[in-house]
Amino acid sequence: MSQITMRQMIEAGVHFGHQTRFWNPKMAQYIFGARNKIHIVNLEKTLPMFQDAQEAVRRLVANKGTVLFVGTKRQARDIIREEATRAGMPFVDYRWLGGMLTNYKTVKQSIKRLEEKTAALENAAESGFSKKEILEMQRDVEKLERSLGGIKNMKGLPDAIFVIDTGYQKGTLVETEKLGIPVIAVVDTNNSPDGVKYVIPGNDDSAKAIRLYCRGIADAVLEGKNQALQETVAAAQEAAAE
């Protein structure tokens, strides 16, 4: 698993919180102090908490669990998509649709519609559709793909969710709380850690910091998958030897 160091966190600006006037007192225990009216996050707390989050992800995935990556703010979108894809995990990078988890049956129907429209589009020219009709079909598919493309291969509700910016993803946390799905989240000094099982106190605005978190969690996923594979191979070899 990638060992993130204190130096890497400092270089990525993980320690820079929000302006002191916007702080959430519930984050006081993770704040080292303030500089130029900006809160400084205590990285001596962040680093071990991030490692705990990585270990939790590794264990969960080693047991065949699924982690949903969520980050829909502008500076997180591309990174969330890239790292979740690298790890082979589902993601939401465009917009959190209300009921994405609590009304999952309806979401599954929308995913089915996306699959049907995609299949129809592939054969549209042969089926005699006009250029205008094909263009409309493309727009429909692109719209659905933007919202649902990252979760279209998800087999059911995720076992955990990894979130960038709990303030931005309030709707996500409401749904995870209702369903009892554990949350791993980056929580900045202006947000509340309530409802988050694995809190990662730190900067949730810097693309460098977001990349560091996402890469670390994706690496933990890949290590968990590798462990699961090794255990499967060992079990098969043991069975063959009997």
Swiss-Prot record:
BP term (GO), one: translation
Superkingdom to which the source organism belongs: Bacteria
Annotated InterPro entries: Ribosomal_uS2, Ribosomal_uS2_bac/mit/plastid, Ribosomal_uS2_CS, Ribosomal_uS2_flav_dom_sf
One Pfam family here: Ribosomal_S2
GO MF term list: structural constituent of ribosome
Residue intervals passing through the bilayer: none
Tagged with keyword Ribosomal protein: yes
GO CC terms in record: cytosolic small ribosomal subunit
Keyword tRNA-binding: no
Keywords: Ribonucleoprotein, Ribosomal protein
Disulphides: none
HAMAP family: Ribosomal_uS2_B
Name of the featured protein: Small ribosomal subunit protein uS2
Species of origin: Neisseria meningitidis serogroup C (strain 053442)
